[in-house]
């Protein structure tokens, strides 16, 4: 094992600077002459994506086969941190077998808005639940000697303009909603690394944000690992290093090294800043490399497939079961309809896409079951194209069956990295099919596949609804067993399903092309809004049915937690997820009506009862006092609410809590809309009162951070042409029903990323020449690009020679 302190004395300043950026898309720099190995990083929120051949960061090229587990959005419905730890251990085992040192996951961004195209990679709208699950994944991954890298830190809630948007959020909301999940993950999971997000937070890029990285992450939480940029996400590398960012990825080349050298020479940063970052990176490199050298190069694919199936079973959510249609009796004549039954949708698109070791198919599993499958019909085109013939054939089959199993869902394009959803609706051809089938056979079980929320105005057309989410490669077997009763669904929703998208508090201005993203709704996201505003929803947070029933009784509560008795009052075994919320009526603060502060899973046989305890932690009663700039507790009477969902509260006890607050955070501000939870249309004036300063107005500037999608603002025909070509290509891909992820990435990419993602082929000086050209200095800009290109080639060659020790 190398001694980092001694190594820092051996390395030249140039070598030190070189180690703080990647060498290839998923590889760090190695320096064999100093005994420093190169290590692999790989995407892996729900399955490893190591690309042995040509690499990319969008999942476009094939990867080594790996187990595809249910996505985070699915596993969150299990409310099972121990299951997350098992999945994490399997991910770590596969990473070690493939010689990957860092698994880039889990993702635990808050689900501010259900249109976020990457929601399938995230756990929940609730920070407590997300943090607990993420901590489980992290512990599991790192139990195999591999480093976990939770992401994206922080306040990233959309894909639109993701590399250049500025999240404007008040400090209380930042702390209580958008950082608490990460805090739990860091303090309870102890990750060796963490990924910074692309976006700015209150005017400063997250990757160089001193408040986030140094004051909170490293200072308050005690994180001593490596902060890794999202791919191409570095804006000012030197400032990032100074303010706590460790490793710039993927491969910016020698230009990045020269940037740090110049910053040290100018006094912008010091060599001690460089050493501090290497003291975070080098132990990770040496420790993980030693663990991988000792790890087997194979893993038990069958065992991991079985784990993926169990994870899918625990993640299924039964949303409707009218007349106890489910489970279906053995021998029932069933018609299987829907393209997803034969061509499964089991994962999302983008950098998390896994090359699965195998994929189960629901139709095959149903045929192998005790059901009498009388036939299958595709029913609809999965990409939304109307087809009367497919619908007619499906209806004819439905007339011959006792029950119809209709598989509906979102297609691969509806949910993807790089692209936010345009609405919450299912394709109309699927809804039309459901209505047509219901007219000839009302006994319909809908199996729904999606990574996030969908609107369900069609719910009355089916008798049962089983939410399969994106259940991974073994999800089909789990669904088949749930339909036949071999598995009793026990999942509960980790996010609210609204009646309509317009009810979502951030609906009015989500994913616009504006440079700023204003978090006007404050604390009121998800159930925190709906319960406070008393707004009806389709399915509340924490909701999920079972084939059995449970009774709650004998609640005892104090400041430490609650204990109660749970009894299975039904006729089959089942698992209940008991949820603990707190409420404070007549609070002097504005606060959500209810907030999740604990939960427990309990599995019971018919008639069995069990005493369970749910403990409260240091986050139960705290709030961030923006005036005192610290965590405090509002004293007084609280209600401890125990229930089966946020709306189904079974037991309640009142307790008195000693307060620590000495000053009211809002005594000099009129914030009625926040006290009422009326945040659908917060005025500029009210939001500015909350922020304590004017709302920043993002202006389009022709500089390094101009995105390619904004080149229409350039003063250059070349810029206009590039913008026009990109726009046309993007529109064509949309019309084909298959948006091009690479073009989408480029469209939202700032010019500076050209120097961060081309392995040194383009320098920042060349980017500055391009900027000059776009500003209207056509000839000077072109000359600058040519000059900087020649200079870059020469300097890179000289530097690489020195770094090789030649």
Residue ranges and their predicted role:
Residues 721-806:
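Extended non-globular C-terminal regions
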């Amino acid at each position: 094992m190398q001694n980092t302190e001694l190594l820092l004395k051996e390395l030249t300043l140039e070598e030190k600077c070189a180690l703080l950026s990647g060498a290839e898309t998923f590889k760090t720099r190695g320096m064999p002459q100093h005994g420093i190995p190169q290590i692999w990083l790989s995407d892996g929120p729900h399955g490893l994506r190591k690309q042995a051949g040509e690499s990319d960061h969008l999942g476009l090229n094939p990867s080594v086969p790996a187990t595809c587990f249910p996505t985070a959005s699915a596993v969150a419905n299990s409310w099972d941190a121990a299951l997350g730890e098992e999945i994490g251990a399997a991910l770590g085992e596969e990473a070690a077998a493939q010689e990957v040192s860092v698994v880039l996951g889990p993702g635990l961004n808050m689900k501010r808005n259900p249109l976020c195209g990457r929601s399938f990679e995230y756990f929940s709208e609730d920070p407590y639940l997300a943090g607990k699950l993420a901590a489980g994944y992290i512990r599991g991954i790192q139990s195999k000697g591999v480093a976990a890298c939770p992401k994206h830190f922080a306040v990233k809630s959309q894909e639109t303009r993701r590399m250049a948007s500025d999240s404007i959020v008040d400090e209380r909301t930042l702390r209580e909603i958008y950082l608490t999940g990460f805090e739990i993950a860091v303090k309870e999971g102890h990750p060796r690394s963490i990924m910074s997000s692309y976006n700015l937070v209150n005017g400063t890029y997250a990757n160089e944000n001193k408040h986030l990285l140094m004051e909170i992450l490293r200072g308050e939480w005690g994180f001593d690992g490596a902060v890794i940029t999202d791919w191409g996400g570095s804006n000012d590398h030197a400032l990032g290093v100074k303010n706590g960012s460790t490793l710039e990825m993927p491969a910016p080349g020698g230009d990045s090294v020269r940037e740090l050298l110049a910053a040290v020479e100018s006094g912008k940063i010091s060599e001690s800043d460089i050493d501090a970052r290497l003291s975070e990176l080098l132990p990770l490199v040496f420790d993980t490399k030693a663990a991988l050298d000792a790890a087997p190069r194979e893993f038990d694919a069958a065992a991991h497939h079985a784990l993926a199936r169990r994870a899918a079973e625990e993640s299924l959510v039964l949303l409707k079961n009218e007349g106890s249609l489910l489970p279906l009796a053995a021998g029932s004549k069933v018609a299987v309809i829907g393209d997803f039954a034969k061509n499964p949708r089991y994962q999302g698109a983008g950098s998390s896409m896994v090359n699965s070791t195998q994929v189960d198919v629901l139709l095959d599993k149903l045929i192998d079951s005790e059901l009498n499958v009388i036939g299958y019909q595709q029913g609809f085109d999965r990409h939304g194209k109307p087809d009367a013939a497919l619908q007619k054939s499906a209806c004819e089959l439905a007339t011959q069956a006792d029950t119809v199993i209709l598989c509906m869902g979102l297609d691969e394009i509806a949910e993807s990295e790089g692209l936010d959803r345009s609405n919450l609706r299912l394709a109309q051809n699927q809804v039309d099919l459901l209505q047509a089938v219901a007219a000839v056979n009302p006994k319909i079980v809908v199996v729904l596949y999606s990574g996030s929320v969908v609107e369900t105005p069609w719910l009355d057309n089916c008798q049962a609804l089983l939410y399969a989410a994106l259940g991974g490669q073994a999800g089909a077997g789990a669904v088949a067993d749930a339909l036949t009763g071999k598995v009793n669904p026990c999942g509960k929703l980790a996010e609210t399903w609204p009646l309509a998208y317009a009810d979502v508090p951030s609906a009015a201005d989500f994913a616009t092309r504006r440079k700023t993203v204003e978090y006007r709704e404050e604390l009121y996201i998800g159930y925190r809004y709906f319960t406070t505003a008393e707004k009806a929803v389709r399915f509340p947070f924490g909701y999920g049915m079972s084939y059995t029933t449970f009774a709650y009784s004998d609640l005892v509560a104090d400041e430490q937690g609650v204990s109660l008795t749970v009894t299975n009052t039904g006729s089959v075994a089942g698992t209940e997820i008991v949820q603990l919320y707190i409420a404070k009526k007549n609070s002097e603060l504005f606060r959500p009506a209810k907030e999740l502060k604990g939960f427990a899973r309990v599995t019971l046989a018919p008639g069995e009862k069990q005493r369970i305890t749910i403990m409260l932690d240091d986050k139960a009663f705290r709030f961030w006092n923006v005036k005192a700039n610290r965590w405090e507790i509002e004293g007084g009477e609280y209600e401890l609410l125990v229930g089966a969902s946020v709306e189904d509260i079974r037991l309640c006890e009142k307790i008195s809590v000693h307060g620590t607050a000495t000053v009211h955070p809002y005594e000099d501000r009129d914030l009625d809309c926040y006290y009422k939870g009326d945040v659908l249309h917060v005025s500029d004036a009210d939001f500015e009162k909350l922020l304590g300063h004017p709302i920043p107005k993002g202006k389009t500037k022709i500089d390094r951070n101009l995105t390619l999608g904004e080149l229409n603002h350039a003063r250059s025909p070349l810029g206009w042409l590039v913008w026009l070509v990109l726009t046309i290509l993007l529109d064509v891909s949309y019309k084909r029903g298959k948006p091009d992820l690479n073009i989408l990435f480029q469209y939202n990419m700032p010019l500076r990323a050209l120097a961060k993602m081309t392995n040194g082929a383009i320098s920042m000086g060349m980017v500055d020449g391009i900027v000059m050209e776009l500003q209207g200095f056509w000839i000077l800009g072109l000359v600058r690009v040519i000059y900087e290109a020649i200079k870059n080639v020469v300097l890179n060659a000289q530097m690489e020679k020195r770094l090789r020790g030649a």
